[in-house]
Design a protein with these regions (language model features):
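Hydrophobic, well-ordered beta-alpha structural blocks that scaffold small-molecule cofactor pockets
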Residues: 1-2, 11
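Metal-dependent nucleotide-binding catalytic modules
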Residues: 9-10, 14-155
Length: 155
């Protein structure tokens, strides 16, 4: 939210909900991994350096973002919401109309990566993606630092 208000104030409200909901499908994929007896293989792949998305795709032929979009489509939620989330794991597939929004979600997802949210490594990855997408990385870095400081103050 700190970063979005600087990147594109008009998108701030529009992206807040997808940013919070984009990992919804992870619960279903975790259950599917368990049902198929693939949990240990999944953990091994991630521990060996595969991203969660790479391991999901390899073992289940889909990713959290794709499943989340399918769930939301089934529930007949907003196409805007669905289209922002659906290609977060492969931004190049996003329609032009949703590309910037999907890129923003990708940067947020990378920085707040479920395995180690706001770790130095994930922050660097997020900054690199932001740079590739043409976003102001200084503003992003400042927003992340502010968020990290706030989280430390809560401990």
């Amino acid at each position: 939210n700190l970063w979005l208000s600087k990147v594109d104030p008009e998108l701030k409200e529009e992206i807040l909900l997808p940013a919070l909901l984009q990992e919804t499908g992870k619960f279903i994929l975790a259950d599917l991994l368990s049902q198929e007896g693939k949990c240990e293989t999944f953990k091994t792949k991630v521990a060996a350096g595969s991203s969660i998305e790479e391991a999901e795709r390899e073992l289940l032929e889909t990713t959290t973002s794709e499943i989340t979009a399918k769930i939301f489509r089934h529930w007949k939620l907003s196409e805007n919401l669905i289209n922002m989330i659906e290609h977060v794991d492969n931004v190049s597939k996003a329609d032009d109309e949703y590309k910037k929004k999907t890129q923003i979600l990708d940067v947020i997802k990378t920085a707040a990566y479920v395995k180690e949210p706001l770790s130095d490594e994930n922050v660097e990855k997020a900054l690199k993606k932001a740079s590739i997408y043409g976003f102001d990385t200084k503003v992003l870095k400042t927003a992340i630092t502010t968020l990290q400081d706030r989280l430390l103050d809560e401990k």
